[in-house]
């Protein structure tokens, strides 16, 4: 029997760059709300035992309704987000089952995640304690100064575009949260919390299709990918 894994779906962010009033988690993709695809992937992964969704207060009932309408029975709680990503995840952590041994933390606005990718990164975390999906970088990346002048060029072979889910052994992640202190608001992903305390994280091969809905062009790309999977 596998360890108890709680998925924490972070869906509390706004949609300023989308230029829409609604939460981007509800953007229709082939006439279905984006978060529906996200929730279904975790529902269908046998390694995931429960799903906790972190959202804005005004979105909570809508998310519950989507779960009920689609038979997504693993959703155990829908809780309010915080002032930062880390605080939102902490709220999710506090709502998980006490039996949880691992947290699989995922962006609600990454609806193209697959069951196979979830399984791959969770199984890696079983072995190492901390793992994330990531893809190789194809563009040349430059480090610039405050005046937008190039300072250096990191080796592309050492760069990864990190995705979610990011999966951590529960005690490790809770310890990292406790040690984040006042810097919590500066963390844009959960791996950064572990990095901050010197922890090691395995990067598992991800898929470039696992995009995050950020700008309007992402909607077109996401729908094209979904059509290709039919």
Regions found by a protein language model. Name each.
Residues 36-99, 180-183:
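Conserved N-terminal catalytic core of the sugar/cofactor nucleotidyltransferase
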Residues 102-104:
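Short aromatic/hydrophobic "clamp" motif used to bind/position activated sugar donors
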Residues 28, 112, 167, 212-213:
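Short aromatic/basic micro-patch
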């Amino acid at each position: 029997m596998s360890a108890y894994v709680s998925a924490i779906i972070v869906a509390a962010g706004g949609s300023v760059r989308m230029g829409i009033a609604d939460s981007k988690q509800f953007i229709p993709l082939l006439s279905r709300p984006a978060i529906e695809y996200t929730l279904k992937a975790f529902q269908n992964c046998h390694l995931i035992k429960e799903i906790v969704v972190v959202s804005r207060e005004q979105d909570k009932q809508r998310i519950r309704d989507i779960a009920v309408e689609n038979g997504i029975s693993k959703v155990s709680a829908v809780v309010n987000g915080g002032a930062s990503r880390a605080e939102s995840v902490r709220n999710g952590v506090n709502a998980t089952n006490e039996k949880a041994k691992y947290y699989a933390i995922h962006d609600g606005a990454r609806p193209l995640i697959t069951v196979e990718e979830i399984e791959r990164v969770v199984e890696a975390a079983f072995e190492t304690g901390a793992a994330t999906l990531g893809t190789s970088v194809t563009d040349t990346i430059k480090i610039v100064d405050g005046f937008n002048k190039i300072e250096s060029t990191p080796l592309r072979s050492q760069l990864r575009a990190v995705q979610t889910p990011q999966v951590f052994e529960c005690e490790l992640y809770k310890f990292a949260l406790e040690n984040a202190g006042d810097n919590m608001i500066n963390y844009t992903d959960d791996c950064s919390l572990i990095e901050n305390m010197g922890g090691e994280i395995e990067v598992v091969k991800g898929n470039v299709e696992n995009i995050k809905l950020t700008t309007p062009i992402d909607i077109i790309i996401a729908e094209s990918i979904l059509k290709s999977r039919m």
